[in-house]
Amino acid sequence: MYARLFLLLLALFSLSAKAQSIQESVAFAIIGEPKYAAGFSHFDYVNPQAPKGGTLTLAAIGTFDNFNRYALRGNPAVRTEALYDPLFTTSDDEPGSYYPLIAERARYAGDYSWMEIALNPRARFHDGTPITARDVAFTFNKFMTEGVPQFRLFYKGTTVKAIA
């Protein structure tokens, strides 16, 4: 999901058109305005007092031979999208709005021809290693060179560059 959302955003912002105004925000919306203000603590449909912890067991029919759901070959394990966090996440109670998860904020052209993303300094990989701009650029470029063909076709002409 992380890579998919990241790439969706890049595709939206890679259109070659004249730049209009420059927007800077924590959240952004493709349709209208984001529902939640900067610094919101939880989505309205989430119970922040819900018990935390425990074990979740999910069943799946079939087999898998890959944890990389974007690989050209093989059968990925069910729910592998839960292994990856996106730069931005969506809310379930509004369409087309994106809120930072690994990202901290975004700066972008009003016509979505480019986007600059600041990463959350607290963002970490599962092993505790900080996520860097180089990691994001590496992931995108890996998809462009070794990912599924649809990815390369969809994001043709899109570039990602780590600037910090």
Protein language model features and the residues they cover:
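N-terminal secretory signal peptides that target proteins for export/translocation
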Residues: 1-2
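Bacterial N-terminal signal peptides
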Residues: 5-14
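N-terminal lobe/hinge region of extracytoplasmic solute-binding protein
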Residues: 20-111, 118, 141, 153
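Short basic (Lys/Arg) and small-residue
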Residues: 123
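Ca2+-coordinating acidic residues in Ca2+-binding motifs
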Residues: 135
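A short, polar/charged loop-to-alpha-helix boundary motif
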Residues: 142-147
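Surface-exposed binding/hinge segments that line
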Residues: 152-164
